[in-house]
Amino acid sequence: MASSTSLQHFAPPARASTRREPARRRLTVMAAVTPATEAAAAGVAEERLEPRVEEREGGYWVLKEKYREGINPQEKVKLAKEPMSLVLEDGIRDLAAKSMEEIDASKVHKDDIDVRLKWLGLFHRRKHQCESLRSPSLYRSYGRFMMRLKLPNGVTTSEQTRYLASVVEGYGKDGCADVTTRQNWQIRGVTLPDVPAIMQGLDRVGLTSLQSGMDNVRNPVGNPLAGIDPHEIVDTRPYTNLLSAFVTANSRGNLAFTNLPRKWNVCVVGSHDLYEHPHINDLAYMPTIKDGRFGFNLLVGGFFSPKRCAEAVPLDAWVPSDDVIPVCKAILEAYRDLGTRGNRQKTRMMWLIDELVSFSSSSLLLPDL
């Protein structure tokens, strides 16, 4: 499925205006649009739609040489060593056998290993280490990690919760757990030597921490009252489970989507209450009926950050419920292939949508599903 067609035409169809433009304005437009300028614009658009990444041996996706100028530091870390090799090539066991001092001494630069560990859901709070010299209470954070899981729709079993509690309890005062705004678990106080055993334990109870941080698809969010909401339109749990299984290849790690330009959020809306906050998700599935068939309208591009808050926009497309995964795949491939990788403040998917809309005023062309 060619991703260049997935986001190639984001703008809705141009609508003929009944308002008559002033003569001077009409003449200016006519003079500006010539065959030469049309050809130039088409050439720019065609070049821009060339995928910027390519698949390499082992299934890893790598940024092409010609697109590496001006990339951000995180992209340089990914180029230097594939983060998922920590899992697929058992690199985490090698790291776990080293002291933090040995790990720090082996770094190419101060953030490389800390960044790559986020693909395993491990977050080392480096800034606290700098403060620890002045504040002894913060020194405990050195060598300790927060571990973020994947918990689609926020559904957890008693067995899973007991296991996480046992992990946290083992760290005494340094251990604690968070419930996140994306319906997820985070456990704190984890030390690197314990990680291989913790990951094995997660697998035994049906959990994973893979692809939960950095430039990956984050935890799929659904209705927190799924299955018991009296105003429920659709039970979101089957769909969020499907999305999580697809994104992580059933917790084995899905290399097709471990090198996105930035993080990517997805949700499935279950009721009119909009608990899932679809307006701030990169892809939101909005339940609706069309011609007697259940499916979803799509919203895309929503996010908020200190630099910009962008509300998701309607894709003006309806998909049947059977196509939830193919649509997600097509949009992720397009974002992976076409998204910019320079200024981290301008690499979320909405920036790509803005750019592609400026190239086209045609209607959306979804790939064959």
Regions found by a protein language model. Name each.
Residues 9-12:
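Long, distal/terminal scaffolding or interaction modules
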